[in-house]
A protein has these predicted regions:
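Short beta->alpha junction loops
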Residues: 85-96, 119
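Short, well-structured alpha-helical segments in soluble
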Residues: 99-111, 131
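N-terminal export and membrane-targeting signals
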Residues: 1-19
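Short beta-strand elements of ligand-binding domains
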Residues: 114-116, 139-149
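Bacterial signal peptide processing site
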Residues: 26-33
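Catalytic-core regions built around general acid/base machinery
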Residues: 124-139
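A charged, well-structured terminal subsegment
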Residues: 170-198
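Glycine-rich, charge-decorated loop segments at or immediately adjacent to ligand/cofactor-binding or catalytic sites
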Residues: 144-163
Length: 201
């Protein structure tokens, strides 16, 4: 008899989870067991108001590689986004500066946070977990651009974006960022290009 009970309880729990998941996605809250902005199939996508790109608040947290940061910023602007850039190069502890910037942007309730060159390892590990959890609880999707080391907890970020400008079929950077911000279906790992459609760099 206990066997049937478990089966029933499991089904009930699954149903409850589905209901909670559905409601939380609609409310724009934190989804269960998945990153904010991590919709991988069209079936999971909840109807959302497609914000105009220029009304998306995109925060980009810099890295020590300012050249790559600049390419990414230019590509976002070329694609109709208006990113706010928070540089960290030249600061005493760049990962710590980046974490502070993420927490500031989470408080400002931006649409998406793009973190360049994140290194979730060693002394930075626990601090990054706390910071990314703060963004998650605020319901803000996080995309990791050219990460050095990512968190093992995949619920803490929506996707990694790796720039590959030699790939002709890579996703335009602005499209990837806008898609994640709007919770469109996307892969966990996205190869992006900073070269605009016009063929000019």
């Amino acid at each position: 008899e206990s066997h049937t009970m478990t089966g029933f309880a499991r089904r009930a729990a699954a149903g409850l989870l589905a209901a909670v998941f559905g409601i939380s996605m609609l409310a724009g809250c934190t989804p269960n067991n998945a990153a904010v902005g991590d919709t991988q199939s069209a079936g999971d996508a909840v109807a959302h108001s497609m914000k105009d790109r220029n009304s998306l608040d995109v925060a980009m947290i810099g890295s020590q590689d300012e050249q790559t940061d600049r390419l990414a910023l230019d590509a976002m602007e070329a694609g109709g986004l208006r990113p706010v850039y928070l540089p960290v190069a030249g600061t005493v502890d760049m990962q710590d500066t980046a974490r502070q910037a993420v927490e500031d942007m989470a408080q400002r309730m931006v649409s998406i946070i793009v973190i360049s060159g994140i290194d979730v390892s060693g002394v930075n590990h626990d601090g990054w977990y706390d910071t990314l959890t703060t963004a998650r609880q605020a319901g803000i999707p996080v995309a990791l651009l050219n990460p050095i080391a990512t968190p093992t907890d995949s619920a803490l970020f929506a996707a990694t974006l790796t720039i590959n400008d030699r790939m002709t079929d890579a996703t335009p950077f602005a499209d990837a960022v806008a898609g994640i911000a709007n919770n469109d279906p996307h892969d966990r790992t996205i190869l992006v290009t900073t070269i605009s459609h016009g063929g000019k760099q």
